């Protein structure tokens, strides 16, 4: 952080530190060390925070983007697209106002809740860069399988739908900072969704599709009228990255 910032925005720095402490406590994480750097005047325009996390590998977990299997259910841990939509509105480039808040949240409690009910989980991914749609295409390619989604089952907040409708954006490709994409056998899906819905920030968890042997490497969408269409794969970022 710049030396000027330490004086001019001391209150902001204290606010950030308090938020870090609150979130770490919520996630059960200890902040055990810290350091600061001083940069010359004009070299930075805000606060830069870099973290290194150290944890333990779960003994009962065996997940990978290469382990999705035909017959698996595709699950999301909550409604999608909130974070990307929130950042878009915060930039105030389109003059749109909507009551949308980011889904940013720690996810360890949600992961633990799933493994408390079953170890039979094949894939877990966060849906940050590129959103849920990009993650699904990556998993389909890594596992050599197809994925069929049901448009009616994908949870999207009405406010996010409205903003996306006005700007021609697809919620599936908006970043999520507090959502998981999970692949697990269909007979485990109900237990996983039930466990997630008891967790903070996962009240809208839902099964949104299934893994298929056909259409390998592709994601197909079953529309509200029952037809099927290939989900387009964007060639780049829909919105400028901020992280």
Where are these regions (language model features)?
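Helix-biased detector of long, well-ordered alpha-helical tracts
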Residues: 3-4, 8-243
């Amino acid at each position: 952080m710049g030396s000027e910032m330490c004086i001019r925005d001391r209150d902001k720095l204290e606010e950030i530190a308090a938020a870090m402490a609150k979130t770490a406590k919520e996630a059960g994480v200890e902040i055990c060390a810290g350091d600061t750097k001083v940069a010359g005047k004009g070299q930075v325009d805000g606060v830069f925070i870099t973290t290194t996390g150290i944890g333990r590998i779960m003994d009962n977990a065996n997940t990978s983007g290469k382990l999705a299997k035909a017959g698996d259910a595709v699950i999301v841990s909550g409604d999608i697209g909130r974070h990307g939509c929130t950042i878009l509105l915060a930039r105030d480039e389109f003059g749109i106002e909507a009551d949308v808040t980011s889904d940013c949240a720690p996810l360890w409690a949600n992961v633990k809740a799933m493994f408390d009910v079953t170890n039979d989980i094949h894939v877990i991914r966060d849906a940050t860069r590129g959103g849920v749609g990009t993650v699904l295409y990556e998993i389909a390619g890594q596992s050599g399988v197809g994925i069929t989604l049901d448009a009616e089952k994908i949870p999207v907040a009405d406010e996010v739908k409205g903003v996306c409708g006005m700007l021609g954006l697809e919620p599936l490709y908006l970043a999520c900072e507090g959502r998981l994409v999970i692949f697990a056998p269909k007979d485990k899906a109900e237990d996983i969704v039930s466990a997630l819905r008891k967790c903070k920030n996962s009240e809208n968890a839902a099964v949104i599709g299934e893994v298929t042997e056909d259409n390998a490497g592709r994601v197909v969408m079953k529309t509200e009228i029952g037809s099927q269409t290939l989900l387009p794969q964007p060639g780049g970022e829909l919105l400028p990255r901020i992280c």
